[in-house]
Amino acid sequence: MNFNSLRKEITSNNASVKELVNDFFVKIDHKDSKINSYICTTKDNAIAQAEDIDKLIQNNEKLPPLAGMPIAIKDNICTKGVATTCASNMLKNFVAPYESTASSKLWSSGGICLGKTNLDEFAMGSSTETSVFGVTSNPWDINRVPGGSSGGSAASVAAGFCAAAIGSDTGGSIRQPASFCGVVGLKPTYGRVSRWGLVAFASSLDQIGPITNTVSDAAEILHSISGKDPFDSTCLDKPVPNYLTDLNKSIKGLKIGIIKECFEHPGLNPEVKESVLSGVDRFQALGAEIIEVECPRFNDGIATYYVIAPSEASANLARYDGVKYGYRSNEGSNLIDMTSKSRAEGFGDEVQRRILIGTYALSAGYSDAYYKKAQKVRTLIRKDFDNAFKKVDVLLTPTCPTTAFLKGDFVNDPLSMYLSDLLTVPANLAGLPAISIPCGFDTKGLPIGLQLIGNVLEEDRILNAANIFEIDAHVIKKRPLF
């Protein structure tokens, strides 16, 4: 159920907030064993939050904007008093001593926390297969992955186990699973939402954002969690607009740029290409002007990302040494031996792989050839976007080259797995807002996502375009049966 449907239930007195929240837990208890979208649920706290909202309703008091909306949180975002594991053996028993800014703003806005969702370990992956708590399944086909790293968040929304979820996006980790699961996923401008309380992966790329059933729900959450934060020096001190104001504005005359390089890439699945191009035709029928643009270095984004992100990860994850917190090995005759064993036993294969890549890229004699060169290419990618936005208002691409793949397909082929992020990483490298919306299905019945990229702090523009498309695209409003 989306926010508006839930509000109708509440305001018409068909159900109390407590009853609605309890219904979600009943569904989770009965069905999440098939999906494994949650690492843990927080039923007692959720019921208490729901009762508080019910009291406000009974007393005819003004309700906060997200009053009674059941929301799940990706388990790399700190929630005070609740385990924040990053789906890793390293933090399996870590309980956060403070609340992240983003989740704190959600609860202040009346949102209700249902629990913490599964992810790839430390958010490093594209399939949610590397979690120490097990693989998450795609509700559209439980033999397939939900995408990653926010796969648990996307799967929980698609399965109806929450009304919305919060994820993090470093190279596509909100948008790619949103595409695979047939829901909406928004990565805001870098700095639009505070990263305080988000366990760091790659600090110049990470961003928190919503995964929802509808574009308007994403706009509501973005409005609630955005804004300056004294705890995050990278958080922008810019006014936060009401993203709902212009959602229904006509897009007649909107200039949408079709990035030529994306549609010519040999890895793009023909069914995905056909569906997204049909979406382009729909935008044109709605009054948008379609313009082909070139971003010559767009496809260099994936190689650039897989130097920069592991480099930053190797520095950020150096703190997990078994001394202050996190997993500590019982073996080791001295500090160095204990630290080495703690990291070897605490981190999974993919995390260790990325730490090694990053350490190598930053090492003496190689940083010029790899890390510094990647930063130069990153600047060129941003310049390509700058040039494109001189001609158009919004850019359009497929979200992913393919639909959801089978579990295990790329477990032993990390390079092919990395290509899942081919079309999403450039927006992270440039710090731009981007949204994935459903645009159709392939012949197997699997969802296909369409990505809209906006200029810096122009979330309102991509939300408007996405919402008009969503309203028009009645044919794709299906839900998975599992």
Swiss-Prot record:
It catalyses: L-glutamyl-tRNA(Gln) + L-glutamine + ATP + H2O = L-glutaminyl-tRNA(Gln) + L-glutamate + ADP + phosphate + H(+). It is an enzyme of class 6 (ligase). It comes from Prochlorococcus marinus (strain AS9601). It comes from the Bacteria. GO terms for cellular component: glutamyl-tRNA(Gln) amidotransferase complex. PROSITE patterns: AMIDASES. SUPFAM superfamilies: Amidase signature (AS) enzymes (SSF75304). HAMAP family: GatA (MF_00120). One of its GO terms (biological process) is translation. Belongs to the amidase family. GatA subfamily. Its EC number is 6.3.5.7. The keyword Nucleotide-binding applies. This is Glutamyl-tRNA(Gln) amidotransferase subunit A. Allows the formation of correctly charged Gln-tRNA(Gln) through the transamidation of misacylated Glu-tRNA(Gln) in organisms which lack glutaminyl-tRNA synthetase. The reaction takes place in the presence of glutamine and ATP through an activated gamma-phospho-Glu-tRNA(Gln).
